Regions:
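Kelch-like beta-propeller repeat domains
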Residues: 1-175
Length: 175
């Protein structure tokens, strides 16, 4: 478990303040124990996309209290600790949080989300990263029919990507 945001002291409707985290929690299946890595990230980060890969956990985008991120990085285990590989994967073309993503046939798909924490708007962004040719970067894919989306669900099956549900909150868009 990495980063995230919550209301640790009070519920939001009771006046609670959202707290953003940079902590990594790791559960060891052999020992049955949790290890906590405080300040694992260089800044708090939440609402990104995570994709499990054989070499580690790929983290894509996300946001903190004030801005969205275009960073893409891999968390991998080296000996008895975890490290961040922030150079092996290309950044997103735009900052994105609250997007969805999935992997199929060596391709990672990222769809929807929002670019900013101010004047929040859902988007039609749709990108594909071919893992065999990361040097090409994230390729822009055609928009889907229908409204822009954030908080959607994405699933890949073979070479196909399916986009379900979500929220549309673009001010100039009719539902």
């Amino acid at each position: 478990v990495l980063g995230g945001a919550n209301f640790p002291d009070k519920y939001p409707w009771e006046g609670g303040t959202k707290t953003w985290w940079s902590t990594l929690y790791s559960y060891d299946l052999q020992t049955g124990k949790w290890t906590v890595y405080d300040d694992f990230l260089d800044r708090p980060l939440a609402y990104g996309v995570s994709i499990s890969l054989p070499e580690g956990l790929l983290c894509i985008g996300g946001c903190d209290r004030t801005q969205c991120s275009d960073n893409v990085f891999l968390i991998k285990k080296e000996e008895d600790s975890f490290v961040i590989d922030s150079v092996s994967y290309p950044s997103l073309p735009v900052p994105l949080a609250n997007a969805t993503g999935a992997m199929g046939d060596n391709c990672i798909y990222i769809a929807g989300g929002q670019e900013t924490m101010v004047n929040e708007q859902s988007t039609h962004h749709f990108y594909m990263l071919y893992l065999m040719h990361k040097e090409r970067g994230c390729q822009e894919m055609p928009d889907w029919n229908g409204p822009s989306l954030s908080y959607a669900v994405g699933v890949a099956q073979g070479e196909r990507f399916y986009l379900f549900s979500g929220r549309s909150y673009a001010p100039d868009e009719a539902m």
